């Protein structure tokens, strides 16, 4: 619970005051700072100290989130956390968000260049169905009333089955600007 953070673009100064003391390893320390060189140094320290490690084997992660919508109705969304191939812009594989702003895009590009990574995922939508997870989640966290659970799928055949439900192009929904 102490490591997760909301998307960087909704974090205000009060959120920072609440999130930063929770852990020296909270995600907001990498994804939120205006000082991209500091974020790059911190990322390097976390990697050197073994706080953040690369998974040795490829995996797909199933994500399930329980939350209450703005209408007061409890909801559950399921998704897949995976990398996607970069295709040429305009190929139709990934559909752009309807509107972005140059300031946030430039800030994200500075962070990407400084850290050589994208600290938070890009949220995309697709037609199809995410598989229902089974067993106990590998990770579970709660932040601001949203309970998030992750299941790791390391078996290549299982990962292929999990990805088979994603049909057609991906639509960028958030995390891109």
List PLM regions with ranges.
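A cross-family signal for N-terminal binding/gating loops and helix N-caps
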Residues: 1-177
